């Protein structure tokens, strides 16, 4: 096409060409989809349903002659196909970047079994129906490609639809939501691979192309790895790469994708692998995620889903075709349902998730449409009737699946709610999800030290599943409350709307460097979140984040910090009040971290030093929660954990276990003694289990201290204050005689009696302190705000 006619056709009465109308179509889809979503969201419907409906409405409007002439001009199909290719390349690359690799590795067996069950059962069900369909549609040749296209199109799962729906339902951080995403990706990748292999066998000329493009993909992956490590060194003082440097990665991906598509091959698998193999740490990764996530999730995917609905048409279908269309939809849903149910039964997945997985994995509309439009030279059976029936079946199944799944979620809301809100019943083999909040680099260093300790680093052993989040809290000045959108806050410092210095992110670069250092050393990805909010509302945003991220414990920085001379400085009462509000409202356990980074707990990564940690146990749910958290410290070879149990001197005791066994660097000082039968049975059972699992194996040291009152407890705490770099203790313990009288000089009730003493600058304690409060629904120990 002549560049001069790119935006205007030469005829005087034709002011627009397909490129212009395509952009107008995109705008209409976005407007219609927002309108539908406004009404459907309260009903629990996901965004893709509203966006596909918007496309269908726009398609129905083409019945009007003027609208038809405007949107469906000459060469418009070529424009739409090419632009959908660009959209597809962008979001497939982002999917590869964002996928949770650790979860996929842990659930590889589950994903493979569900994928095979889905495809095999669907294939068996479709085999007899295909015989009927060939005769009904009067297919004369190319039976293999017809069956292959039919099977792949109708047994496939549209991974982008699954991902977007799971995110809208806030299940992307749950086990079942991530499993659905993994299965959707596996099903789609498997179908692409099968189709490509069979097509290359039929053509006889594509096999060499596949090997060449596989090699080229490997070269792109190596090039990306080199650029990802080299480009940040060019401007080390910048938080993000420049837009030109970001564009370089996009151009590389588009070049390889266009080259592959020009050979009649599908580039989706190659682009996905490039994103999957991209380095997941450092400035480059953060830049790509920050620059791509917002436009793709808010514009690219809605337009792509709307285009699926826009292709919906039944104009070429007659009444007898509707019966076949209904049978196609029913058999497709049945095949997916039976396949997933058999797989879930084999894998012993809880029954409440079976129907959810089967309906969620029934959504269509991605690769099915791509394969339908490609390689037409090998599809002699391709007619407008076949096209309309395929597309109609895909759209109807996607809408039905989305509606059924949302209704299922509403009816079984408790089954999908976040239930791992405390650590006491956790096992270290389960995934630990934590959120640590920081205001600046000073808090970040201490928080990363805590994350490093919980990561369970031990050479030669496999670490427990661990997902840490670091949230950068940025108090928003009142004058900026309504001036900026969230994504505008991440622009370069030179932005006239306010830069890093103005919004408290001038320390962001140092925070990023600290996280990168930890990631390189421990190979554990710390997911970063930025929270920009007025201080008076920040506690609500933190509490919402704990639910959305499904964390079991959130760590908050203490409102005082240690200066370089060792003295303590108050950062402001506003931070203290914010912590206390989170303690009241958070739907998970909370830890307040008093970081004495100069004399206390230090970063473990990059050092071979062993740090001594003490867990203080008086009894009660908070102390049990604190000791439960310490279970993850036992897996770290750089942590020497000692449990110190305080027992009332007048309590009756009996010996229930034999002498403890110890290993090198882990001294067990005394035999554990159970509480009297009059004491809390839950504490006794919990401590026994902990002792038998960790103390008798020599992983943990154990000390018993007998005290009569709070003064004796204070004396012991002063004696051991210099022996440990970190104290872990519960916040409350009710009416405890061992701490009686200690609250007479309490300064910070949010730390509890013991935690307040350990954090006080007037005491001879130089260790850092972590005060833990177990999640509960009622509180009675707070001073009025």
Swiss-Prot record:
**What does the entry state regarding organ or tissue expression?**
Specifically expressed in pollen.
Give any Pfam family that matches.
CHX17_C
What is the membrane topology noted in the UniProt record heading this document?
Multi-pass membrane protein
Localization, per the record, is: Membrane
User: Which BP terms in the Gene Ontology apply to this protein?
Assistant: potassium ion transport; proton transmembrane transport
What GO molecular function terms would the record report?
A: antiporter activity
The membrane-spanning stretches of this chain are 19-39, 44-64, 79-99, 112-132, 143-163, 179-199, 201-221, 240-260, 294-314, 323-343, 352-372, 389-409
| Main function | May operate as a cation/H(+) antiporter.
| Record-stated family | Belongs to the monovalent cation:proton antiporter 2 (CPA2) transporter (TC 2.A.37) family. CHX (TC 2.A.37.4) subfamily.
PANTHER family the UniProt entry points to: CATION/H + ANTIPORTER, CATION_H(+) ANTIPORTER 1
User: What protein is this chain from?
Assistant: Cation/H(+) antiporter 1
Encoding gene per record: CHX1
